[in-house]
């Protein structure tokens, strides 16, 4: 039975093998290469490698011949293309006169049909990539990227014609030359393509740069060709001015390391080149460091971890020296001071404001950079195998910096030393000596790194098993607190509280008595005097730190032929020792904390009492809550701020927390304004110690206001009662006073005029009283009791005194209707008209009256 085969298309034929099986040959007639086979998989005759040197001119001739043969084969392929007449005509129309998108689509079809025959189409696509239109250029670049990843590039690096190992062989055919010529063309073409990407990666438009970063990452991930140049481009984008681009580049590098773990060492070396380049900015270093410290390491990648440690230490040393130079350069000169003092010069004020903003931004970046270095050291050390010699070299450099640099720099260096030492599970005595010495540094008072310093102090002491050394630190912490500001004192007390909780043996410093030298017993030793004994009476062996060997002192004297030596052990505390573990703090009492029990700052006093009596301290320390600025901010009453937006999830971003979260100046932690009745109505036990001053102040003001209003009301009522009694007595003596107002011959117009004059006089006197009351209220807040009583008495004498809580709308910005005020206004007008009638009647009274009518009043 005959086998049926599909009808071949024009230009195709059926090829039968020896077994009689037929296959359709997709290769058009007259074409040397099958378009269905990738160009790098085309079967070629095997050649033996020939290492014979080939002349450069001969290589150029071979390449020219290969390109010429390839061009002729491409023309034959286009003539016998397996498209219908209509399809071929449509493609030619789109390429010649279509839109850019249509041209790109048509050229893509030609390249996909047979890449080795589409040299002209590839060159046309590359020309579109260089257009000024960003949309067209990015579209063509994305199309070429898809072609390269989709099969145009092999999974190996391309070679130029001169790099072919079999070029000098005698059996080289035209097929070899055509394939090698196309590969050489493609390598040059790909390099030009990367150059266009590099130019567009510095474009002013953000979306163009973002697309270029994505293209570079995709090419790096998929193909090895030009990976060194592509990696350099990707890492250079860490220094982009746009933070979004730098962040995207950092993320792309980490994704590349996850896809190709073997490239971590290559990537790290390239990052090392970038971070130590002179043109790399501080912000670029930050993005570079967070890329390095987020590199995932394993115990098999020791070389990568060692390189990271080397980068961190070298960069940290260079950074500290750069910061020192910047501090010297930013020191204000006389000319700068004169400009700053000129308050009328608006330009200098604006320049100073811009300079302050710049310095603030630089300090923020510097702190982030140092934090990134410390994080990287902490993560890389467990996987590194740094030899002792190199580690000691790094440590010696860092310790030298602590003694010469500024205090802020010294704190950061100590943090790095602690991180590195803790990673090796060994913290030297040299580190604790430096930390112990830093407590006496006078620059600690004005340092902006107090929070970092306290954290370092806590982390260093909480893991120290040397109890006498920890006791010495606690003694010195209390001693230096005597001249420090309350924010730092509260922080030190919090550190001590945590140490006492963690180590119960430290509690004896608050309960046991002080041990002195005279508390120990002296021991006398008698021995015969040797002839070769030294005649010196006193001799003491001391080490370089000034401490006596075995903590003992000796004295000797000779009685006859008998030498008597007394040996006395030093037990008292000596705070002058350089090494804290030899200061004898284990037998000392913490008597220095006694003055803090009555400290002027309520929080310091509370913390001191809690330490002495062993009470628990609630909450976390926040140094900013105890500053003078924070205290004064509480007098700025304003509406609570809106809740802050949720923070990101970056590992480099700290989480929000603590009692200061959402805290608004002028309010308690619950958000209740201090000048409201809701705050003053609380019990005193519910008020934090740092809010007691405000609680007492507003409570006293509220009570005095109530008393003043009550006294005013009582006097008004007494006056009205006396006036009613007088009126009743007059009516009893003169019944004709009950006549109607119409019968009275009293001129109401004259009375109104007289009352108006009286009202103006009373208003003038009231204004004078107001001025006097305002002047009395402008006295200092902290006054003695006599002044306060005088102020209260003066408030009672004036009718128009303004009370603190008379109208809550004066303090709280709420829009409510004042119905009570309207009612009071109506009552006041009615009272005024009633008094007016009484005054009219009193004017008609006779000058003389019977004494009997007033007898009962005179008796009282």
UniProtKB/Swiss-Prot annotation:
Biased composition (Basic and acidic residues): 334-345, 536-551
GO biological process: ribosome biogenesis
Modified-residue entries (Phosphoserine), positions: 744, 748
Name of the protein this chain belongs to: Uncharacterized protein C4F10.09c
Record's keyword terms, sorted: Phosphoprotein
Region: Disordered, residue numbers: 334-360, 530-551, 708-798, 813-842
Stored InterPro entries: ARM-type_fold, CCAAT-binding_factor, CEBPZ/Mak21-like, EF_Hand_1_Ca_BS
Acidic residues: compositionally biased ranges: 716-725, 738-750, 813-824
One protein family per Pfam: CBF
Entry GO terms, CC: Noc1p-Noc2p complex; nucleolus; nucleus
Domain of life: Eukaryota
Protein family membership: Belongs to the CBF/MAK21 family.
């Amino acid at each position: 039975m005959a086998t049926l085969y599909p009808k071949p298309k024009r230009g195709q034929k059926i090829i039968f093998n020896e077994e009689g099986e037929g296959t359709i040959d997709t290769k058009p007639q007259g074409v040397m290469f099958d378009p269905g086979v990738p160009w790098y998989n085309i079967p070629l005759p095997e050649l033996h490698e020939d290492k014979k040197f080939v002349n450069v001119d001969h290589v150029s001739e071979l390449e020219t011949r290969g390109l010429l043969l390839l061009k002729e084969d491409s023309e034959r392929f286009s003539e016998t293309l397996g498209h219908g007449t209509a399809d071929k005509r449509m493609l030619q129309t789109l390429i010649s006169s279509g839109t850019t998108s249509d041209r790109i689509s048509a050229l893509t079809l030609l390249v996909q049909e047979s890449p080795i025959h589409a040299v002209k189409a590839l060159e046309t696509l590359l020309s579109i990539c260089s257009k000024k239109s960003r949309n067209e250029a990015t579209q063509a670049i994305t199309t070429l990227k898809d072609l390269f990843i989709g099969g145009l590039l092999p999974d190996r690096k391309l070679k130029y014609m001169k790099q072919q190992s079999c070029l000098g062989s005698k059996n080289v055919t035209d097929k070899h030359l055509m394939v090698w010529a196309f590969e050489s063309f493609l390598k040059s073409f790909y390099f030009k393509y990367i150059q266009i990407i590099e130019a567009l990666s510095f474009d002013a438009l953000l979306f163009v740069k973002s697309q270029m970063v994505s293209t570079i990452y995709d090419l790096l991930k998929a193909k090895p060709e030009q990976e060194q140049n592509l990696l350099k481009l990707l890492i250079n984008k860490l220094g982009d001015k746009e933070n979004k681009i730098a962040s995207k580049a950092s993320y792309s590098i980490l994704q590349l390391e996850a896809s190709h773990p073997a490239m971590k060492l290559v990537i790290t070396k390239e990052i090392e080149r970038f971070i130590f380049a002179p043109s790399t900015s501080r912000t670029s270093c930050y993005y570079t460091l967070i890329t390095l410290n987020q590199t995932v390491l394993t115990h098999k990648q020791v070389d990568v971890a060692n390189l990271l440690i080397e980068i961190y230490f070298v960069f940290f040393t260079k950074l500290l020296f750069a910061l020192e130079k910047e501090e010297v350069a930013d020191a204000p000169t006389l000319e700068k001071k004169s400009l700053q003092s000129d308050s009328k010069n608006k330009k200098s004020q604006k320049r100073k404001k811009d300079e302050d903003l710049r310095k603030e931004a630089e300090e923020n970046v510097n702190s982030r950079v140092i934090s990134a270095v410390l994080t990287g050291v902490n993560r890389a050390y467990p996987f590194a195998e740094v030899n002792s010699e190199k580690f000691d070299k790094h440590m010696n450099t860092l310790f030298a910096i602590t003694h010469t640099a500024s205090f802020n720099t010294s704190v950061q260096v100590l943090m790095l030393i602690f991180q590195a030492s803790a990673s090796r599970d060994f913290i030297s005595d040299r580190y604790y000596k430096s930390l112990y010495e830093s407590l006496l540094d006078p620059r600690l008072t004005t340092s902006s790194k107090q929070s970092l310093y306290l954290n370092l102090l806590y982390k260093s002491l909480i893991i120290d098993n040397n109890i006498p050394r920890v006791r010495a630190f606690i003694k010195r912490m209390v001693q230096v607190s005597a001249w420090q500001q309350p924010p730092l004192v509260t922080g030190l007390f919090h550190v001590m509280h945590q140490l006492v909780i963690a180590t119960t043996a430290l509690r004896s410093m608050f309960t046991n008595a002080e041990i002195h030298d005279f508390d120990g017993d002296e021991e006398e030793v008698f021995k015969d005097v040797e002839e070769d004994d030294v005649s010196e009476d006193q001799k003491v062996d001391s080490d370089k730190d000034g401490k006596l060997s075995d903590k003992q002192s000796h004295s000797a004297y000779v009685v006859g032929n008998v030498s008597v030596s007394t040996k006395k052990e030093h037990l008292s505390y000596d705070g002058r020792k350089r090494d804290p573990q030899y200061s004898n703090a284990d037998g000392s009492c913490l008597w220095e904390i006694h003055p803090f029990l009555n400290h002027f700052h309520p929080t310091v006093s509370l913390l001191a009492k809690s330490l002495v009596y062993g009470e628990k301290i609630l909450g976390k320390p926040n140094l900013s809550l105890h500053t003078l600025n924070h205290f004064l901010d509480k007098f700025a009453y304003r509406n609570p701020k809106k809740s802050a937006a949720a923070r990101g999830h970056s590992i480099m971003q700290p989480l929000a927390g603590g009692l200061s979260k959402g805290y608004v100046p002028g309010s308690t932690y619950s958000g209740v304004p201090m000048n409201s009745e809701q705050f003053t109505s609380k019990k005193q036990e519910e008020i934090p110690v740092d809010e007691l001053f405000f609680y007492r102040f507003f409570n006293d003001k509220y009570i005095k206001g109530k008393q003043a209003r009550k006294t005013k009301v009582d006097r008004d009522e007494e006056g009205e009662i006396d006036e009613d009694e007088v009126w009743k007595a007059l009516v009893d003596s003169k019944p004709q006073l009950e006549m109607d107002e119409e019968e009275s011959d009293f001129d109401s117009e004259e009375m109104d005029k007289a009352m108006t004059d009286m009202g103006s006089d009373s208003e003038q006197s009231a204004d004078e009283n107001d001025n006097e009351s305002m002047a009395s209220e402008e006295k200092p807040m902290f006054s003695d009791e006599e002044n306060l009583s005088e102020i209260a008495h003066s408030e009672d004498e004036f009718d128009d005194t303004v009370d603190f809580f008379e109208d809550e709308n004066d303090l709280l910005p709420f829009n409510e209707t004042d119905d009570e005020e309207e009612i009071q206004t109506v009552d006041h007008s009615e009272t005024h008209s009633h008094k007016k009638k009484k005054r009219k009647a009193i004017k008609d009274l006779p000058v003389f009256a019977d004494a009997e009518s007033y007898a009962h009043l005179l008796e009282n």
